[in-house]
Amino acid sequence: MSLAKAKEIVSGNPVAVFSKTYCPFCVSVKDLLSKLGATFKAVELDSEKDGSEIQAALAEWTGQRTVPNVFIGRKHIGGCDATTALHREGKLLPLLTEAGAIAKTSTA
């Protein structure tokens, strides 16, 4: 059930961040996404009744047990390091735009 819930969240949102409210790496990723103007769904596993089950299901699905666990355009990205590395390389914004998390603008 928890895996189905996780997959439903991932498929229903351009960006999904499985997070914990007290995790500084999670806060960093959510802050970065917000600064970039991305629309994302944050699932705070420590606030969810079945959060530990969802986290275990994510580990089974992605091989990553740690948070944040980031998905963009239904693709598993990884955690904070992977997300910030994509940003440093100039690859995060195009991924977010392609996924529909950022509105395309005509301004340069």
Curated annotation (Swiss-Prot):
A Pfam family recorded for this sequence: Glutaredoxin
SUPFAM superfamilies, sorted: Thioredoxin-like (SSF52833)
Record keyword RNA-binding present: no
Location(s), subcellular: Cytoplasm
Keywords associated with the record: Cytoplasm, Disulfide bond, Electron transport, Redox-active center, Transport
Listed PROSITE patterns: GLUTAREDOXIN_1, GLUTAREDOXIN_2
GO annotation, cellular component aspect: cytoplasm
Domain (Glutaredoxin): residue spans on this chain: 3-103
Primary localization class, coarse: cytoplasm
Disulfide linkage: C23-C26
Gene Ontology molecular function: any one: glutathione disulfide oxidoreductase activity
GO biological process: cellular response to oxidative stress
Family: Belongs to the glutaredoxin family. CPYC subfamily.
Matching NCBIfam families: GRX_euk
Free-text function comment from the UniProt entry: Has a glutathione-disulfide oxidoreductase activity in the presence of NADPH and glutathione reductase. Reduces low molecular weight disulfides and proteins.
Name of the protein this chain belongs to: Glutaredoxin
Organism in which the protein naturally occurs: Solanum lycopersicum
Lineage: Eukaryota, Viridiplantae, Streptophyta, Embryophyta, Tracheophyta
